[in-house]
Amino acid sequence: MRDYIVRATAYNNKILAIAAFSTQTAQKAKEIHNLTPTTCAALGRALTAVAMMRVMMKGEKDKVTLVIKGDGPIGNIVVVSNYPGIVKGYVGNPTVDLPLSEKGKLDVGKAVGKNGYVTVIKDIGLKEPYVGTVELQTGEIGEDIAYYFYTSEQVPSAVGVGVLVGKEGNVLASGGFIIQLLPNIEEEVVAKVEEALKNISSVTELLRKGYLPEDILNHILGEMGLNILERVDLKYECDCSQERFETAIIALGKEEIKKLIAEGQSVEAVCHFCGKKYLIEESRLKELLRIAEE
């Protein structure tokens, strides 16, 4: 089944709701980066979150990057969505694998760590992108992003993301939701939403039962006039190119390019997001130097 995201509102547009089914997306990330069950769960959660965050943005050319930097062994988690429904990402140490937590679940929180930061970079076409940074709370990713929304954007939010990994290490199911309460919402409605959220043991449990994005939102907001606005296909896709890496070489400046030429070797670049290798020969480096000198 294809991956997709649903965007909806409820209670006369006073509740914004997003839900995602991201199984193939998480599986592709697992295959590209050769992830362990623990790192697959961590990156899969982050990819699901950034995909939902991008769908919440209005401009066609808007971009969002989510960076999670904790003190755990996984290192940095970087995920990007430059287009609606298109995501890519990587983790600093993809080989980390930890024992299950006390609850018998993949220990993403321990892999990420609790000391560190969540940074969200939103590029909406202005001179400078919006950058918001908050401290990590649990390292479980969902709670950390909810804390970001509340602290940095002043929007009370509930965020749930989960990845179910099988015994063979493949992704059985992946998905998540974001529920946001907009200004001037009545207290009794807030209480209803909170009660509905309390009845969810975990996102992975809903996914295990076969819930799709519409089912998840109905489960939480079904009695509050849920209104589905759009469905967006979701996939893992990298937009790297030879041209982009050559632009990065030019940005190093002419002195650095001269050093590369003096070494008399080709330059090999590897994309962090998809592992694709790009080779820039010495003759091409000289051409890039001429461009840098212009």
From Swiss-Prot:
- Determine if Zinc is one of this entry's keywords: yes
An example GO CC term for this entry is: cytoplasm
One of the Pfam families matching this protein, by short name: HSP33
Q: What keywords sit in the KW lines? A: Chaperone, Cytoplasm, Disulfide bond, Redox-active center, Zinc
**Which GO BP terms apply?**
protein refolding
First-listed, main subcellular location of the protein, grouped into a coarse class: cytoplasm
Q: Which Gene3D superfamilies match?
A: Hsp33 domain, HSP33 redox switch-like
Q: Give the NCBIfam families listed for this entry.
A: PRK00114.1
Name of protein = 33 kDa chaperonin
UniProt organism field: Thermoanaerobacter pseudethanolicus (strain ATCC 33223 / 39E) (Clostridium thermohydrosulfuricum)
The major lineage groups are:
Bacteria, Bacillati, Bacillota, Clostridia, Thermoanaerobacterales
